[in-house]
């Protein structure tokens, strides 16, 4: 829990945790060169000499697939995908253990998304960095994730290994989400059951309903769902998965 830490107490954590932001156009200062942007974390934390910082910037640009000549250029001279690579290089500057990637490809063209996703996967594999990848794109999530946490109104409703979750969702909201993923089925195949359309409107997160937050739209709602909020628990026989649903016997 770091939300209660003071600015001074949080400083050591910032070296271990970094972020890649959704908007590659708004997350880079137009007045700073790429070198200044990538070097900023090193400057803030006083890492290395001026020469060592220049060397580190060149290394980081190479890691994310940008040439050394990019260092003296400005953000407006790059494409969206290249700008996001700059943002990733900045996040890597302090050798973090954990990176929050907040919708890092949603603002990019589809043709560029795969390049950035492959870069993130390579960094995760080669550098051993843990990524918290936030996205609403289920195809992207399936491509990059080892474990998936499904949230509804700011609450986790299911957490499972990626393959297990896509193969057999247990929470009704997860089931509805995955039913919206297009599937190619061979003639005569019974794989998939069509899209599950939820009724009603999404409640306000500021004033969520009592009990399970999903109960006003759940097609399998029970009386207990309207008054008692379920907690995340592992269903019987599935120790690698947790579900917050009374259907799975996960009441308090």
Map each language-model feature to its residues:
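P-loop NTP-binding/switch modules centered on Walker-like glycine-rich loops
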Residues: 100-190
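Conserved ABC ATPase signature
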Residues: 74-78, 82
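Charged, flexible cofactor/metal-binding loops and thiol motifs
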Residues: 161-252
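Conserved ABC ATPase "signature" region
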Residues: 1, 43, 52-69, 178-179
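A short, proline-enriched helix->beta-strand linker immediately N-terminal to the Walker B motif
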Residues: 93-97
């Amino acid at each position: 829990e770091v939300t209660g830490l003071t600015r001074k107490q949080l400083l050591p954590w910032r070296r271990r945790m970094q972020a890649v932001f959704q908007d590659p156009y708004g997350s880079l200062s137009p007045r700073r060169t790429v070198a200044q942007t990538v070097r900023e974390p090193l400057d803030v934390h006083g890492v290395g000499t001026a020469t060592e910082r220049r060397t580190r910037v060149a290394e980081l640009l190479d890691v994310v697939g940008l040439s050394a000549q990019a260092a003296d250029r400005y953000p407006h001279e790059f494409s969206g995908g290249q700008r996001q690579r700059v943002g990733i290089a900045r996040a890597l500057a302090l050798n973090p253990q954990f990176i929050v990637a907040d919708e890092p490809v949603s603002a990019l063209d589809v043709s560029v998304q795969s390049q950035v996703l492959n870069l993130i996967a390579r960094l995760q594999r080669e550098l051993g960095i843990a990524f918290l990848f936030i996205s609403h794109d289920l195809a992207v999530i399936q491509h990059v994730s080892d474990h998936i946490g499904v949230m509804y109104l700011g609450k986790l409703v299911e957490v499972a290994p990626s393959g297990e979750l896509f193969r057999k969702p247990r929470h009704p909201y997860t089931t509805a989400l995955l039913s919206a993923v297009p599937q190619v089925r061979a003639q005569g195949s019974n794989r998939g059951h069509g899209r599950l359309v939820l009724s009603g409107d999404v409640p306000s997160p500021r004033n969520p309903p009592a009990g399970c937050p999903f109960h006003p739209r759940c097609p399998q709602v029970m009386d207990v769902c309207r008054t008692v909020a379920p907690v995340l628990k592992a269903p019987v026989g599935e120790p690698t998965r947790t579900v917050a649903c009374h259907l799975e016997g996960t009441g308090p």
